[in-house]
UniProtKB/Swiss-Prot annotation:
Heterodimer of a large membrane-associated beta subunit and a small pyruvoyl-containing alpha subunit. Belongs to the phosphatidylserine decarboxylase family. PSD-B subfamily. Prokaryotic type I sub-subfamily. The record marks 251-252 as: Cleavage (non-hydrolytic). The modification Pyruvic acid (Ser) is found at residue 252. It catalyses: a 1,2-diacyl-sn-glycero-3-phospho-L-serine + H(+) = a 1,2-diacyl-sn-glycero-3-phosphoethanolamine + CO2. Is synthesized initially as an inactive proenzyme. Formation of the active enzyme involves a self-maturation process in which the active site pyruvoyl group is generated from an internal serine residue via an autocatalytic post-translational modification. Two non-identical subunits are generated from the proenzyme in this reaction, and the pyruvate is formed at the N-terminus of the alpha chain, which is derived from the carboxyl end of the proenzyme. It comes from Bordetella avium (strain 197N). This is Phosphatidylserine decarboxylase proenzyme. It is found in: Cell membrane. PANTHER family: PHOSPHATIDYLSERINE DECARBOXYLASE, PHOSPHATIDYLSERINE DECARBOXYLASE PROENZYME, MITOCHONDRIAL. It is a peripheral membrane protein. The gene is psd. Keywords: Cell membrane, Decarboxylase, Lipid biosynthesis, Lipid metabolism, Lyase, Membrane, Phospholipid biosynthesis, Phospholipid metabolism, Pyruvate, Zymogen.
Amino acid sequence: MSIKDQIFLASQHLAPHHLVSRGMGLLADSRIPALKNAMISRFVQRYNVDMSEALVEDPLAYPCFNDFFTRALKPDARPLDDDSANVLSPADGTISQLGPIREGRIFQAKGHSFGLTALLGGDAERAAPFEGGDFATIYLSPRDYHRVHMPVTGTLREMVHVPGRLFSVNPLTANTVPDLFARNERVVCIFDTAYGPMAVILVGAMIVASVETVWAGLVTPHKREVRSTRYGPQEPIVLERGAEMGRFKLGSTAIVLFGPGRIRWFDTPSVRGPIRMGETLALPANHLEDVPAV
């Protein structure tokens, strides 16, 4: 490991994660033209952001940096896989890992894994349907489209905010920080689907200002404790396949979980390979009529 990497990792453990993130959040929400234009211009240049797909192509037309970062795309920019039975990638990014959930552990990187129950907020009953199932971890780089969409149609059952640290998420931290995704702050969304239970976890990272969902808006609890909100059949929240479910403001990673025997990977997507929202991530393990809805 280089000296530079060692210094970076030391800073990750010593930095006041939430204080840094709150400060960056204030800057990212600033509507002072000179400040927000300088931030956006520098970001576009540094990360070579492709604005041709954006609904509003002029990066300086956005009122603040966060609006630019969570920009909408043109309606035809991300066509969905034609076969409605196939499971879609929820986001643009890189498949950092995918595979089976074994003995309650999810693979993070060589020599590292993290606990399924810990990832989902420490509730063994919540985790049980996914034991022996499958997971995919998708990392969203700074230049990527940062809205997260539904892999399949689902009815929201529960949303859980899990407080935690805000380590940066990148190959270096994935290979060196134990239990990275089960330590970082995250929002867990559990859906009932034709494939059984599905979880979509939005994992925060250093300088992540916030996470939003389309049903709850900003997820910003004041107490440092796990908070669960359950949704009943009286006013069901149903999100269609490909519909937006949430977005990152300066953030980070989406993890998708399915129960055992529900899906199989589409042509074994390449770990470290790029994927776009709407592309096929997985196929149903059986015909959908043979997979009872929960």
